[in-house]
Amino acid sequence: MPHTLPLRCTLPLAILLLVLLSPVQAAELFYLGQKIPDIHKPWNSADYQQLLDALNKVDSTQLNALPRRSGEFTGPIYQRMVSEENFRPQLNIYAPLELRQNEAREALFRLKELMRLYFDFRAVQQPYAAEALGLMSYSLRQQAVLFTLTTEFWMTLSASEQSNPVRLQGLHETKAAAAMLTSSALDYLGLTKQFGREELVLYSAELSKQLPGLFIHLSTDVRAALLQRIEQLAQQHTYSEVQASMRELQPVLLSIQRDVQSKLAAAEAQPRQAPTRSLDLSVPTESAQ
């Protein structure tokens, strides 16, 4: 990407520009000349899109200028990106479930686009290591929220709707996307040359908190493969702190695995009800004669 303006000339002067419209209106916030969403309220998918558009423009003209995780000026922007408060509207039970599910799906898509902006695998070392890994762990939480809403929506469907090929395909795609995201999240723990020790240690601690919420929604074979990878990381990872985080995660996931298997076994053991015979309203043969 072309970088035409040196950051040191513009950053002290134009890092943030707040223009207050009136006491009752929200402040307009600009980052290096690009308008971004209000960081004082939860973001939705449209806010993430606005941020993504702004940061793409910034990244095309400024070197090393994306918001940092702990920057004095940019920290609040990044913290809003990965704030738990952003999930509250999606989990608001008084809002229509299907709308909340669609919003969670759109937000996850834009988070993945933000990750692509922050990750640069052409680089020997990641320029935004902490920020990129933070977005990955936050995306796992968003994926778990989407799965929760998808499950709730699924339970509202009739048996015929649940067996609808289109519905089943949508559920399959959601599970496949979650499996891919989870696998990628663990892949990053092995990139010790591109990410520093401090960043990977923090990331592994975040993963140990986020993975259980998503693990329960994964398919049986994916859960089994994930447990094997966690065990390998707990024994063989380069950094002892990462090993410790994975060891703490293991019993949590194993407990979930046993619980899921127990419920599946109980469901299989349930006697299947014979189909109810339809009421025969035809005239008996003898009466008809």
Go through each PLM region and give its residues.
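Bacterial N-terminal signal peptides
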Residues: 10-21
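Bacterial N-terminal signal peptides that target proteins for export
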Residues: 1-12
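Generic extreme N-terminus detector
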Residues: 5-6, 21, 230
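Sec/Tat signal peptide C-region and signal peptidase I cleavage site
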Residues: 22-26
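Non-catalytic all-alpha helical scaffold/repeat segments
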Residues: 27-288
